[in-house]
From Swiss-Prot:
Organism expressing this protein natively: Vibrio atlanticus (strain LGP32) (Vibrio splendidus (strain Mel32))
EC numbers on record: 4.2.3.4
Subcellular location(s) of the protein: Cytoplasm
NCBIfam families: aroB
Protein name: 3-dehydroquinate synthase
Record-listed NAD(+) binding positions: 71-76, 105-109, 129-130, 142, 151, 169-172
GO annotations of cellular component type: cytoplasm
Organism taxonomic ancestry: Bacteria, Pseudomonadati, Pseudomonadota, Gammaproteobacteria, Vibrionales
Gene: aroB
Cofactor(s), by name: Co(2+); Zn(2+); NAD(+)
EC category: lyase
Keywords of the record: Amino-acid biosynthesis, Aromatic amino acid biosynthesis, Cobalt, Cytoplasm, Lyase, Metal-binding, NAD, Nucleotide-binding, Zinc
InterPro entries on file: Dehydroquinate_synthase, DHQ_synth_AroB, DHQ_synth_fam, DHQS/DOIS_N, DHQS_C
Role description: Catalyzes the conversion of 3-deoxy-D-arabino-heptulosonate 7-phosphate (DAHP) to dehydroquinate (DHQ).
An annotated GO BP: aromatic amino acid family biosynthetic process
Length: 362
């Protein structure tokens, strides 16, 4: 078992990572007896894991209820958010209630945002069940819902009290979802840790075989990197923006094609190739480094191409709404090597177009 701390002074919290954590109530023992707890999940995850979590809470002495939401990125919106608010209000829950987000990134983002808003803020716990949510979205306090005009445009920075990661959850995850999570795992190597990138190149097969030691190693390294970055820059005014490698292009794909048609990690993978090609055209990385990035994403069974139906104009329409845009100036996260990246402003549009068109040929 690995334990990592996100250091944010009085708002610091632990991340527990291991196999079989859903069998041990110790990870929820910080909850007081008779504590009211609402477990919020979706119709896919709840039948698999809700009873286990409710049983742990019962052993701790909590009073529990379960809310099941529809499953899918298309439900990460204000309508679903409102249904959570209605459930909480109709249940007469006061400010001492704790909510648990049991699911993937959609559940974590939506429930975290609901927790930040309900009666101006209540405690919540992240129990992520997908690889993507375990290595990325459950850590760091970004919470949000989507708007038809842009992804994650309505949200807040709001930290959980604890993150509990049971790697055994990944045994029920479809391979497509696992691959989507690998896009975020690979991202950490590209932007922050060349040695980890090399380790991933050598251990992809073990990860896809769900080797326990390999999974814990990879998830722990990703969480440690994110914890380090968030401790330095919680609200993304500096270094935290680097965690958005591939996301400016990727969010454009999701918004244009409709949320849920491409998984978030699939869009990030395609976006990472476009960002890497942009960097290579700008002279920031070599052809060999570009090829390593493309190769590892391809070997991880991820898309590396541009969606055929999307024009350059489609991309720019959405990218100019990106949260990193300042004073009308598009800023892109670009790799400067394997293991380093920076935010680059004012990339010429013809370079961006070349990068997008390059990915059409892959």
């Amino acid at each position: 078992m690995e334990r990592i701390t996100v250091n944010l002074a009085e708002r610091s919290y632990p991340i527990s990572i291991g196999a079989g954590l859903f069998e041990d109530p110790a990870y929820l023992s910080f909850l007081s007896g008779k504590q009211k707890v609402v477990v919020i999940s979706n119709v896919t995850v709840a039948p698999l894991y809700a009873d286990k979590i409710l049983s742990l809470l019962d052993q701790v002495g909590c009073q529990t209820s379960l809310l099941e939401l529809p499953d899918g990125e298309q439900y990460k919106n204000l309508e679903t958010f409102n249904s959570v608010m209605s459930y909480m209000l109709e249940g007469n829950y006061s400010r001492d209630v704790v909510v648990i987000a049991l699911g993937g990134g959609v559940i974590g983002d939506l429930v975290g945002f609901a927790a930040s808003c309900y009666q101006r803020g209540i405690d919540f716990i992240q129990i992520p069940t997908t690889l993507l949510s375990q290595v990325d979205s459950s850590v760091g306090g970004k919470t949000a819902v989507n708007h038809p005009l842009g992804k994650n445009m309505i949200g807040a920075f709001y930290q959980p009290k604890s993150v509990i990661i049971d790697t055994n959850c990944l045994s029920t995850l479809p391979e497509r979802e696992f691959a989507a999570g690998m896009a975020e795992v690979i991202k950490y190597g590209i932007i922050y840790d060349e040695a980890f990138f090399g380790w991933l190149e050598q251990n992809l097969e073990k990860l896809y075989q769900l080797d326990e030691d390999a999974l814990i190693t990879a998830i722990a390294r990703c969480c440690a990197i994110k914890a380090e970055v968030v401790a330095i820059d919680e609200k993304e005014s500096g270094i935290r923006a680097l965690l958005n490698l591939g996301h400016t292009f990727g969010h454009a794909i999701e918004a244009e094609l409709g949320y849920g048609n491409w998984l978030h990690g699939e869009a990030v993978s395609s976006g990472t190739v476009m960002a890497a090609k942009t960097a290579q055209l700008q002279g920031l990385i070599s052809q060999q480094q570009l090829e390593r990035i493309i190769s590892i994403l391809k070997n991880a069974k991820l898309p590396i191409h541009t969606p055929e139906s999307m024009s350059f104009e489609d991309f720019m329409k959405h990218m100019m709404r990106d949260k990193k845009v300042l004073s009308g100036q598009l800023r892109l996260v670009l790799p400067t090597s394997i293991g380093t990246a920076e935010v680059v402003a004012d990339v010429p549009q013809d370079i961006i177009k070349q990068a997008i068109d390059f990915c059409r040929t892959l």
